[in-house]
Amino acid sequence: MKRRNFLKALPAAALTLAGCGQNKTAPANTASLVFDHSYPLDYATQFSADCYEGGYVMIDIPDAGRFLVVPEGAAEVDDLPEDVVVLRQPLDHIYLVSTSVMDLFVHLDALDSIALSGTKAEGWYVEEARQAMQEGRIAYAGKYSAPDYERILAAGCTLAIENTMVLHDPEVKEQLEKFGVPVLVERSSYESGPLARMEWLKLYGILLNKTEMAEEVFRQKVEQVAHILEQENTGKTVAFFSITTNNLITVRRTSDYVAQMVEMAGGVYIFDDLEGETSAQSTIKLPLETFYARARDADVLIYNSTIEGVMETR
C-alpha cells in the first residue's frame, strides 16, 4: 500500500519559498502593529505565526504563550497585551535546554546563537554541539530543573528555549522570567507526525531571522522523504524499545512519531494497538514477558539508547 497520506501536496507558493503567504484573512491588528499575513505552515499545528508590516512577527504557541519578534533596530510597539513576550533580535545568547532543538539549529547554521546548554558535552548526540562545548563556544548552564542562574545572567542570555519538562518545575520558569530572561516552551513533541515536528525549523528561522534558509532546508527534507513514501510497504515488522533500571520495557505508543516513521520507511510497527492514557503520553511501559511475547518474531529490533543509555549484556 502506498504511504502518500503522510505527505501533503505542497502548495506551489510553499515550493517557491513563499514565507509571505497570500492569505489576507486578517485578525484584528494589535495596537500599532499592522497585520500583513499569516505565515504558511503545511504540517505543524502546535504553533502559528502572524506577520506584520515592518518585519514584526507574532508567534503563538498554545498553552505556552505569545511572543512578538522585533527586528533589530525596529521601534518598540506600544500597548501590547500583557501576555505577549517581546523578543528583540538578534537572539544571539540563547540558553538551549530542549535537546531536540539542537539539530534544527545545526541545519540553520546557527550554533553561534547558542551561548548556553542544558546538557553537558558528553550528553550530546549531536556531534556539532558536543564539539562546540568541548571547544568552549557553548557553556553548560545546568539542566532544566537546576539552571545556573549566575552563569545565565553573566552570559547576557536573550532567550531560554525549554521543553515541557520545565512545566513540572514552574518556579524555574518564573525565576528566569523574574531575572528578565524570556522563556519559550517548545511543543514540537505534541505534533502528530515527523514532518510536523520538523516544520518547527521554520519557527527558529523566524526567531533567528533565517526564514528563507529554514524554508529551503525544510523543502529539501520533504523532497528527500517523498520518494520513500512512493515505495511499497516491505511488510517487515519492527520493535522500537528501551529497558528501564527496574527491568520494564518502554515502547512507543501506536500514534507516536517514531511508530509513524517506521511505517513511512516501509515497515510495520509491531505494537499497533498501544495508546497511552493521554494524548501527551508518547511511551508505554510493558513487563518483560509481555514485550517478549509480542516482539520475539519481529524482523527488526531497534534499541533506543538515548534515554536509558547503551544496553550491556553479560
Residue map of PLM features:
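Extracytoplasmic substrate-binding proteins
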Residues: 93, 137, 150, 154-248, ...
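Short, structured coil segments at secondary-structure junctions
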Residues: 110, 179-180, 265
